[in-house]
């Protein structure tokens, strides 16, 4: 037990993340800025700044880690198990480990989320699958339909490496209107 003058020893140093030094990666239509990686936090958590365009959001999935996000701007519809929740500016959401989920920006303006994943690791999956871009607001580069199809085939294997699973694309369709499904398909380039 540490007293006022001694503390348990650590070799870890202060981690500082400057905007110009961050890695920014595109996952589908979204752009994620990796603010803190697992290497910064002894793999306890990672922190990302996510820009989700209208219709954007990930594929339905589940992963071992807890995922929390805070909606800084805009709104996203969150689907978890059989529940749909609208998370608006100022809302915080926690998704338990291994809970099937997805979120989509079903509005007409971009949404910005701060996302914490504990334990870290999910950011490494994003870095493996997505192209790097210059800034957190840089839109994804154009991707051919062949490259998109190739990546969708690879995703389940890549996800497994990071203790995650990709779910069927229509997992949460029963909770969305026809117009919302069209918006999501358009963001995905379909």
Question: For each predicted feature, which ranges?
Answer:
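Tight coil/turn sites that cap or link beta-strands
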Residues: 53-55, 89-90, 98, 108
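Short histidine-centered beta-strand/loop micro-motifs
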Residues: 36-37, 57-63, 104-106
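A hydrophobic, small-residue-rich beta->alpha segment in the mid-to-C-terminal subdomain
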Residues: 124-145
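Short, conserved beta-strand element in jelly-roll/cupin
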Residues: 47-54, 62-80, 116-119
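A short, N-terminal "cap"/entry segment at the start of jelly-roll beta-barrel domains
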Residues: 1-44, 139-190
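Short acidic-glycine-tyrosine-enriched beta hairpin
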Residues: 82-100
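Structural motif
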Residues: 31, 68, 75-77, 84, ...
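Ligand-binding loop in jelly-roll beta-barrel domains
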Residues: 41, 97-124
């Amino acid at each position: 037990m540490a007293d006022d003058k001694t503390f348990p020893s650590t070799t870890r140093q202060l981690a500082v993340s400057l905007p110009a030094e961050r890695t920014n990666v595109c996952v589908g239509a979204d752009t994620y800025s990796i603010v803190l990686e697992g290497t910064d936090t002894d793999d306890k958590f990672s922190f990302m700044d996510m820009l989700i365009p209208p219709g954007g959001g990930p594929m339905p999935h589940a992963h071992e880690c807890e995922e929390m996000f805070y909606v800084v701007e805009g709104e996203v519809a969150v689907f978890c198990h059989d529940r749909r929740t609208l998370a608006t500016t100022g809302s915080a959401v926690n998704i338990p480990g291994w809970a099937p989920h997805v979120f989509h920006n079903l509005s007409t303006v971009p949404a910005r989320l701060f996302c914490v994943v504990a334990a870290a690791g999910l950011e490494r999956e994003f870095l493996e699958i997505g192209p790097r871009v210059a800034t957190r607001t840089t839109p994804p580069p154009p991707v051919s339909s062949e490259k998109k199809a190739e990546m969708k085939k690879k995703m389940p294997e890549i996800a497994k490496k990071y203790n995650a699973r990709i779910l069927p694309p229509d997992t949460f369709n029963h909770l969305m209107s026809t117009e919302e499904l069209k918006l999501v398909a358009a963001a995905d380039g379909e």
